[in-house]
Design a protein with these regions (language model features):
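N-terminal accessory targeting/assembly segments
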Residues: 1-43
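Active-site flanking residues adjacent to catalytic metal/cofactor-binding acidic residues
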Residues: 23, 51-52
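Canonical P-loop GTPase G-domain recognition
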Residues: 45-48, 54-109
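ATP-binding Walker
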Residues: 112
Length: 114
């Protein structure tokens, strides 16, 4: 199972131009995958931290997290909060990298809102 997981992760990283890591805004340290982040950084591709479930997170903590993780966008899949900001961030990063129609890959632990 672990081999299959990394095979999928490596495939997503290989195919995508921009990658989104979906993280639970209430438990960032527990839901980030530093190995995945390292693989993305080594690939030279853009990683956007997507802080899902922001409607359930402490606002003060969320502001600190957004400053520490860059680029990041706070969203709530439940009520669609932040989706336009996420689209805008993807467009900004795509233009910065010269992609007209970027392939976007989504990574993260299960139950994070992918």
């Amino acid at each position: 199972m672990a081999g299959n997981f990394w095979s999928v992760v490596n495939g997503v990283i290989s195919e995508a131009d921009i990658l989104l890591e979906i993280i639970d805004a209430r438990a960032v340290a527990q839901t980030r995958n530093l190995e995945i982040e390292d693989k993305v950084k080594k690939s030279g591709k853009t990683l956007i931290y997507v802080l899902n479930k922001c409607d359930l997170a402490d606002k003060g903590d969320l502001d600190k997290i957004k400053k520490a993780l860059s680029p990041s966008v706070a969203i709530s899949c439940k009520d669609h909060h932040g989706m336009n900001l996420l689209r805008e961030r993807i467009i900004i990063e795509a233009k910065r990298k010269g992609f007209e129609k970027p392939k976007v890959g989504v990574l993260g632990y299960p139950n994070m809102g992918k």
